[in-house]
Amino acid sequence: MNRVLYPGTFDPITKGHGDLVERASRLFDHVIIAVAASPKKNPLFPLEQRVALAREVTKHLPNVEVIGFSSLLAHFAKEQGANVFLRGLRAVSDFEYEFQLANMNRQLAPDVESLFLTPSERYSFISSTLVREIAALGGDITKFVHPVVADALTERFKK
């Protein structure tokens, strides 16, 4: 069984992330969205909420599972029986970091391959950082995130 692990902070999950998950769900038997705790990034949403939002966004995909984790990614992949890491590349500027990450992961988990997918053109410019900034300033984010995520961001910035 081919199990792909799609790791990220997903703070928040965007339509770009959703696009990659949809496509991965057609390519692999099982997709695990691995939501990283990432405390050093100081996420806007707590881990539990990011997991819940990702589950809501992907609930229509029967072969997709969402799990939060705070361990080393290579160890988590082994625990989950994943044989592929999925990473998205929006632009050439993403490649250098992703290349380094793939090589490090290969050293730590030699049995897990890294697979890079580019997003659909309509999502190639979306990033969680930009979505958070637009939401914080009261801008319309409905084109970039699922309605449940837009509601969560609106609620978060009301405070």
From Swiss-Prot:
User: What Enzyme Commission number does this protein have?
Assistant: 2.7.7.3
Any one GO BP annotation for this protein? coenzyme A biosynthetic process
The record lists substrate as bound by: T9, K41, L73, R87
Query: Which cofactors, if any, are listed as required?
Result: Mg(2+)
Origin: domain of life = Bacteria
The disulfides recorded in the entry are none
Catalytic function, reaction form: (R)-4'-phosphopantetheine + ATP + H(+) = 3'-dephospho-CoA + diphosphate
- Give GO cellular component annotations, separated by semicolons: cytoplasm
What are the UniProt keywords, alphabetically?
ATP-binding, Coenzyme A biosynthesis, Cytoplasm, Magnesium, Nucleotide-binding, Nucleotidyltransferase, Transferase
Known partners and oligomeric status: Homohexamer.
Tell me which family the UniProt entry assigns to this protein. Belongs to the bacterial CoaD family.
Q: What HAMAP family does the annotation carry? A: PPAT_bact
Q: What is the protein name for this chain?
A: Phosphopantetheine adenylyltransferase
